[in-house]
Amino acid sequence: MPRRPINKKRTLLPDPVYNSVSVHMLVNRVLKSGKKSVAYRIVYNALKEIGDVTQKNPVEVFEKALDNVTPRVEVKPRRRAGAIQMVPRVLRLGDRARANSLRWIMEACDKRSGQPMVTKLKSEILDAYKKTGFAIRKKEELHKIAIANAMYAKKPQVIINAINLLVD
C-alpha cells in the first residue's frame, strides 16, 4: 500500500465566454506571473481573429487544431541492460495527451518572434488547423521515434496501429 496519499484529480471549469474547458486550459498555459486577465485577453483576441479569418466558430477551429496536434503515443526512457531505450506507449485521448498538445502549441508561439502574442497564438492555431507548423512537426517526430522503437514496447503492434489510425 502506498504511504503517500493519492491526489484527487481537479476538475476544470469551462471558461466564461466560450464555455469550453479546452479554452480554459489554453488560458492557464498562456498565463504568466499570475496575470490571468492578461491571459484571457490574449486568448480571446486570438480566437476572435481566428473567427474573422476562417468565418467559422473559433472554438471549433481551436478544438480541431488541438485534435490535429494531440499525440496518440508517448515515449519514455527506460534503462535496460545498461542502455537507455525509448519505450513507446499508447496515450488515451485524455488530459496527458491534451496537455502535450497545448505545451507544443505554446512552445511554437515562443519560437515565433517579432510579433505580439495574440498574432503568434492565432498563427500557430491556424497552422495546427491546416496540419502544418511546429506543433504538428513535433507530433510527427514523436510518432517516428515511437515507430522506430516499437520493438521495445510490450505490444508493438498496438503502438503501430495507434499511429496508423491517424494516417487513415
Curated annotation (Swiss-Prot):
Coiled coil: none
Keyword ATP-binding: no
Molecular function terms, GO-annotated: mRNA binding; rRNA binding; structural constituent of ribosome
GO annotation, cellular component aspect: chloroplast; ribosome; small ribosomal subunit
Keyword vocabulary terms for this entry: Chloroplast, Plastid, Ribonucleoprotein, Ribosomal protein, RNA-binding, rRNA-binding
InterPro entries assigned to the protein according to its UniProt record, in alphabetical order: Ribosomal_uS7, Ribosomal_uS7_bac/org-type, Ribosomal_uS7_dom, Ribosomal_uS7_dom_sf
Principal location: plastid
Subcellular location: Plastid, Chloroplast
Keyword flag Hydrolase: no
One BP term from GO: translation
SUPFAM superfamilies according to UniProt: Ribosomal protein S7
Record's subunit section: Part of the 30S ribosomal subunit.
Function: One of the primary rRNA binding proteins, it binds directly to 16S rRNA where it nucleates assembly of the head domain of the 30S subunit.
PANTHER family from the UniProt entry: RIBOSOMAL PROTEIN S7
Family, per entry: Belongs to the universal ribosomal protein uS7 family.
Name of the protein this chain belongs to: Small ribosomal subunit protein uS7c
Native source organism of the sequence: Chlamydomonas reinhardtii
Lineage: Eukaryota, Viridiplantae, Chlorophyta, core chlorophytes, Chlorophyceae
Gene behind this protein: rps7
